[in-house]
């Protein structure tokens, strides 16, 4: 039976833009992938040769494609170039000769043609340009005229012949018999030569072609031919017209253009040949010229990029948006590739079931199964595909760090790590945030910083709802749930949950000082301390004066090189001087918030305050759907849903931990084992004693100028000063009432909203504050932890105990300004003041008689009740 050949154009399916629009996304993707598989099978049988065309009988000369001659451009090519889909491929930098080759044969308009323009095929095609130029033409001393009439073979040759000029050396590589295969894909039939055995062997990782020089194996005959040239280092293919040598026949197939009218240009510097457009771009590398210079940067666009495309990098024009996640792209090709993540159309490995979004990633992964891993580490037994990776891995065992920094002498294993480290010394921060303008040394740091603006926290804790922007923060948080402390100190056996804390702790035992001063030889534990010390020598060289004397002449103040301009006090570090200067500038608040107008004395406090306005609140709580942050959500959920399995037998109070129950039982036992050595005050818990002892030991350097009260923290002083100044920066949006503290405003707003988040589990009563709920629970439990030391009477609230103790002491702190009468309670004073003001707030509804206090009204109403009872 005679073999019948069918061209691709006969079996191809033509689709218009209207046909593609009718196909859905899922059907279109299925059609695309199936067509791609068929197309790749065809190209395995007969790789494309875009540079030369010939008839099978060899009667006609080779014709240059449209890429080299304008006369050869067909109408199909022109029509294809103008299509919208082709514009995307030209923007991607695809070879014009490839597209025109496909269009000329009617290949682009078929379903197989479109399928070929895909990531995997084009990446392999463009990544190895010489793969397009491989030819089976053997040049055994033939003239250039004879070169043009060579026959392009339509099948795979059973013998691969390589000629080396005068001394020819032939490698015979046997290939398996080609058998015709019939396919019925896409409602069409076609015959093609396919080597199923060879294809299966490549998939299984077999490499049947072996080099006789070094024994290296290859999966294809042409790869063996290319490898064999590396042994001879000769150029076996010689062009007879100019006697110029080439490494491959493919290079020779391109070179005749210089003799047949095609204009190729040779670089005088390197001797490399180029086409006209490529030669112009190459010359600019020598002259330093940067055409098409962007107004936004000093970098010219690459030669394969149009100026319009280069401007998109500065204008940030991203007109293609993803409907799933809202991410924007500059090209529709990037959007299509991104959408595969949402559709979950994944490619699975048949051996290890690993999945990938792109086919090319699957092919790269399959090479790990097929490749012969001959490089093995003798230390740990790890296997590598390449010897270079093994050498790099062995440096870890040997501790080698060949790349050294010239500034500090620090060494690194990789050159890329050294370059990133050198940016610390040069101050280069190429990665800049578009939101706030902050710059970073590394791109990964910029990505982590952007999550502050977007609120994106991909790393979630499985135990609670808390999420984190960095995996290291998640690991540190998970140690709270597991209570695991895997890092142990070898000296004292103390354990830590974080490796950083262990490193800091070990410095206490070793007392190593790795940082040494080059001037005086003094060593330090921290690098920051060394920098602070080096500034002393820098000031000495500049002749810095303190109180009219040079530092060298005053050894006591040698390291106090930072001087206050107001009181002339000196300090050893700049941070100490900054803290000291706040004493002189106290009350001055130059940093003002743009949102609410609040002013601060320090820039760091302003930044911390601005987070209140820019805070992302992604969670809702309560029936009204109030927006809260993740931290607030955790506190609310832990309060309402936390289990309390440990119950007190005395009062019935429950606890989440047994340690809390043990501490609580000390209240009923009356034990106060922790006693202060200075004031004999006792406490039930050790942490309370530690906090109390700080009141004796710690100084209070911050003094209020109005009343002389001292404070330990500036924030406490600022809150206290609002009492004297009457400042109330927090204003209620409902009624306009102002408050001095933000916590007071939050509690007040619950009156308007009616929110009562704290609910009693016993009776269901709700409260606006957690402290009110705690006091209310004592009604059910009968707990009265506050006991009077004089009479032994117990109270549920501390305020009640304070009022009761005034009976024993006779203290009456509330006095009337009119008559001077004193009272124990402020409520009694308010009632007394109504005597002077004649104010009557409580009125009887029956006789309209008014009273100053509610108790008098209640006694009066009993009169009406008795009269009604008598009637």
Swiss-Prot record:
Region (Disordered): 47-81, 140-164, 290-318
Positions with biased composition (Polar residues): 71-81
Keywords of the record: DNA-binding, Isopeptide bond, Metal-binding, Nucleus, Repeat, Ubl conjugation, Zinc, Zinc-finger
GO MF annotation terms: DNA binding; zinc ion binding
Originating organism: Homo sapiens (Human)
GO BP annotations, alphabetical order: mRNA 3'-end processing by stem-loop binding and cleavage; regulation of transcription by RNA polymerase II
InterPro entries tied to this protein: KRAB, KRAB_dom_sf, Znf_C2H2_sf, Znf_C2H2_type
Pfam family, one: KRAB
Name the record gives this protein: Zinc finger protein 473
Basic and acidic residues biased stretches: 145-154, 290-317
Domain notes: The C2H2-type zinc finger 2 to 6 are necessary and sufficient for discrete Cajal bodies localization. The C2H2-type zinc finger 5 to 10 are necessary and sufficient for interaction with LSM11. The C2H2-type zinc finger 2 to 8 are necessary for interaction with the SLBP/RNA complex in the histone pre-mRNAs. The C2H2-type zinc finger 2 to 10 confer activity in histone pre-mRNA processing.
Region (Interaction with SLBP/pre-mRNA complex): 312-552
TM helices/strands, residue ranges: none
Residue location of crosslink Glycyl lysine isopeptide (Lys-Gly) (interchain with G-Cter in SUMO2): 148, 419, 549, 558, 635
